[in-house]
Amino acid sequence: MKERLTITLDKDILQSLDATIDGVTIRNRSHAIERLLDMALMHSNPRKAVLLAGGPFVSFHGKQIPKPMVPINGRPIIDYVVRELKRNKITDIIIVSSETGMISEYFANENRLGVKISYVVEDTRKGTEGALYIAKGLLGRDPFFVMNSDCIFKINLEDVYKQHVATNAVATMVLVTQEVTHKFGLTKVTGLKVTSFVEKPKVENTDVKLINAGIYLFNPAILSKIRLGTKPVMFETDLFPKMAEEGILYSYVFSGLWAKLDMWNLENSVTRLSKVASEGLKNGG
């Protein structure tokens, strides 16, 4: 139940307030004030993230290792993700994997990074959606990030959160531009809404270049939409296409540092990411 409130504002503040009204996500002054108060009273950024670290092992230099443990300049690629979360003040991290031994051994002294890491073990491969499903008991009532563990990136996650709140989204997907798109989840966007999502399209699309970066911000309401199956259930082929069709999947387009491990050409990809990490993360990460 809402109550009427009368307030007096300076003219300059009122002009700034009116500038946020777009008639769609912010309908009027009352709505603008309510939304800004919501943003001010909530945490500046979610403090929890789920890292999806499952999938089959990969062969690297004669050894079978989990993909998140592939070394980039002497550090597992998942280490870059954890450090980027810490840089964004996200310190409660849940890692979901079918094999956590090597990962947990590496992060045995996570206190040195200033984070708390919990582990959820898949008894069988669950897929990206299934992995979140088995971790939902650790998520609480606040928004949370979910991301892949095979990318190097540098992003202001607070900006993602601010847009997520402003659009009243249940799910926000970070998008990046790529020239070659057939290896990724390809999106079409109208305004901020994702209107179409196709995972790894068979035919290269020369018109659409926005792809899924594997970084998501979810409200707890998403947990009622995900499912666990007898076979792996994927965000990319199950949840996201449905949400795009329903018009409830939002996007955040990102133009900063982002590079993904390419399993089709692993050795060259490691070389490329080593260069990206050396040149792009000079000031931390």
Residue ranges and their predicted role:
Residues 43, 87, 138-141, 154, ...:
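Alpha-helix termination/capping residues and helix-transition junctions
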Residues 78, 135, 150, 164, ...:
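Residue-level signal for inorganic ion chemistry
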Residues 22, 26-31, 145, 152, ...:
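Catalytic-core segments of class I nucleotidyltransferases/pyrophosphorylases
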Residues 184-195:
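Acceptor/aglycone-binding surface of glycosyltransferases and processive sugar-polymer synthases
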Residues 112-114, 166, 189, 246:
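Short, well-ordered coil/turn elements that cap or connect secondary structure elements
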Residues 2-6, 11-51, 56-59, 63-64, ...:
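Conserved N-terminal catalytic core of the sugar/cofactor nucleotidyltransferase
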Residues 167-177:
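A short, conserved acidic/glycine-rich loop-to-beta-strand motif
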